[in-house]
């Protein structure tokens, strides 16, 4: 199985990120740890950990303790940097410029109306929550190559009549 390099921080993003992001990414790079390895230690999903690194998720006291342990970062400094509410959605231009992120945007452009129609047929008038939500990424391999499998799981929230 081929080992791929770990994800590091794109310096162009730094002005849009909280102070914790460079701290976390520098320690991740120094230790040569994947998000998967960090997530296993913390006890969370790797996408949740990556979101935390980019300032898009809130860290619990337990998350901070575990991150401090695995990354050898002072817990007090990490707690100070990770306190407060995340400024979600602040890292992206729309439409996105990065090809990987643009493909996700393109999926919504191409299939968004179809997703909406099928969701409404299955659940009724409402929306899928991105708050009561989880996601995961899996790698599948078959005779045609490697495939990315992204699962989105959100609670269905029916619109209220008033």
From Swiss-Prot:
Keyword Lyase among UniProt keywords: yes
InterPro entries per record: Cro/C1-type_HTH, Cyanase, Cyanate_lyase_C, Cyanate_lyase_C_sf, Lambda_DNA-bd_dom_sf
Reactions it catalyzes: cyanate + hydrogencarbonate + 3 H(+) = NH4(+) + 2 CO2
MF GO annotations: cyanate hydratase activity; DNA binding
Enzyme class, first EC level, given as a word: lyase
Residue ranges that the Swiss-Prot or TrEMBL entry lists as coiled coil: none
Pfam families, sorted: Cyanate_lyase
Domain of life: Eukaryota
Keyword Acetylation: no
EC number, as in UniProt: 4.2.1.104
GO biological process: cyanate metabolic process
Active-site residue numbers: 103, 106, 129
Keyword terms, alphabetized: Lyase
Job of this protein: Catalyzes the reaction of cyanate with bicarbonate to produce ammonia and carbon dioxide.
Family: Belongs to the cyanase family.
Protein name per its UniProtKB record: Cyanate hydratase
Biological source species: Pyrenophora tritici-repentis (strain Pt-1C-BFP)
């Amino acid at each position: 199985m081929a080992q791929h390099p770990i994800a590091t921080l794109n310096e162009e993003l730094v002005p849009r990120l909280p102070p914790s992001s460079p701290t976390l990414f520098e320690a991740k790079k120094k230790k040569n740890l994947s998000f998967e390895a960090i997530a296993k230690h913390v006890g969370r999903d790797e996408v949740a950990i990556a979101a935390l690194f980019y300032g898009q998720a809130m860290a619990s006291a337990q998350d901070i303790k575990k991150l401090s342990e695995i990354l050898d970062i002072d817990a007090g400094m990490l707690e100070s940097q990770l306190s407060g509410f995340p400024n979600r959605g602040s890292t992206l231009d729309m439409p996105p410029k990065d090809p990987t992120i643009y493909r996700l945007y393109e999926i919504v452009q191409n299939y968004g109306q179809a997703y909406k129609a099928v969701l409404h047929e299955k659940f009724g008038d409402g929306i899928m929550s991105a708050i009561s939500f989880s996601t995961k990424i899996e790698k599948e391999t078959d005779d045609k190559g490697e495939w990315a499998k992204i699962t989105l799981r959100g609670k269905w929230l029916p619109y209220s009549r008033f």
